[in-house]
From Swiss-Prot:
Protein name: Acetylglutamate kinase
Catalytic reaction equation(s): N-acetyl-L-glutamate + ATP = N-acetyl-L-glutamyl 5-phosphate + ADP
Lineage, broadest ranks: Bacteria, Bacillati, Actinomycetota, Actinomycetes, Mycobacteriales
Subcellular location: Cytoplasm
UniProt-annotated site: Transition state stabilizer, residues: K33, K250
Gene Ontology CC entries for this record: cytoplasm
Cross-referenced HAMAP family: ArgB
Family membership noted in the UniProt record: Belongs to the acetylglutamate kinase family. ArgB subfamily.
Pathway assignment: Amino-acid biosynthesis; L-arginine biosynthesis; N(2)-acetyl-L-ornithine from L-glutamate: step 2/4
Organism of this sequence: Mycobacterium marinum (strain ATCC BAA-535 / M)
Keyword Cytoplasm tagged: yes
Highest rank taxon of the organism: Bacteria
């Protein structure tokens, strides 16, 4: 069934059922981490851009933080540069960082800005380097219980929320590439999940949405019946050591956001067309909701 095949009455019912969520979210900030299939499949890319325009025109303030891992990997391959991952994070040498800056802001960010702006003059692309939006601090990762260096990879030490609030007040949609200098001006690549959580906390967001390529959070992946629809932070912390490496940054981001005061974080299925609207405006949703213990 598509929207075209619904009766007029059914369409009206769908819209009416969204009213409680529209009222809850009106005037509020929603931070969305955009990544996975949603940014490589053309139909999903178009749907995501339309969702952002929809939120903006409903009086909701979306702030988009995008990844770009597959695109960075592809460009590294074209340039003959070897890449590596440790603990779910890309090892970032100065050479890899140059490629990441080029791809994240010059390619991925531009494409998303243009897709959103096909609906109106809404989106503005920025990086953590602009207006001192982010200050980074170098981080390591835990691999088999050992702190391991991963190069020019940072965590968010500080967020200059005022830099984004100016854009939000002007009814723009910030589209953020996660590159930021440390206190000495050395630029670091920040994991987009990590950056999205820090932004959600600093902006006092109502929700943090994390787009993934799975249906949500599984307690015993790949057992399909272990999918969790809602989990609190205490249970999630217990689960963290058993998760696959690629899911760890996303779960850490949800924990950081909710612990920092964001009412809920959501790990949602980015393979579902209009997944953002499905999660925000329907009872069923399309993923796992994380709430405070």
């Amino acid at each position: 069934m598509t929207i075209e095949t619904l009766s007029t009455q059914s369409k009206a019912q769908v819209l009416a059922e969204a009213l409680p969520w529209l009222k809850q979210l009106h005037g509020r900030v929603v931070v969305i981490k955009y990544g996975g299939n949603a940014m490589t499949d053309d139909t999903l890319r178009q749907a995501f851009a339309a969702d952002m325009a929809f939120l903006r025109n409903c009086g909701i303030h979306p702030v988009v933080v995008h990844g770009g891992g597959p695109q960075i990997t592809a460009m590294l391959g074209k340039l003959g540069i070897e890449g590596d991952f440790k603990g779910g994070f890309r090892v970032t040498t100065p050479e890899v960082l140059d490629v990441a800056r080029m791809v994240l802001f010059g390619q991925v960010g531009r494409e998303l800005v243009n897709l959103i702006n096909a609906h109106g003059p809404y989106a503005v692309g920025v990086t953590g380097e602009d207006a001192q939006l982010f200050t980074a601090v170098r981080r390591s990762v835990n691999v088999d219980g050992v702190a391991t260096d991963i190069g020019l990879v940072g965590d968010v030490d500080h967020v200059n929320a005022a830099a984004l609030m100016d854009l939000i007040a002007a009814h723009r949609i910030p589209v953020i590439s996660t590159l930021a200098p440390d206190a000495e001006g050395v630029v670091h690549n920040i994991n987009a999940d990590t950056a999205a959580a820090a932004l959600a906390e600093a902006l006092g967001a109502e929700k943090l949405l994390m787009l993934t390529d799975v249906e949500g959070l599984y307690t015993s992946w790949p057992e399909r019946d272990s999918l969790v629809r809602e989990i609190d932070t205490a249970a999630l912390e217990q689960l963290l050591p058993r998760l696959e490496a690629g899911m760890i940054p996303k779960v850490e981001a949800c924990l950081r956001a909710v612990t920092g005061g964001v009412p809920s974080a959501h790990v949602i299925d980015g393979r579902v067309e209009h997944c953002v609207l499905v999660e925000l405006f329907t009872n069923a949703g399309t993923g796992t909701k994380v709430v405070s213990a």
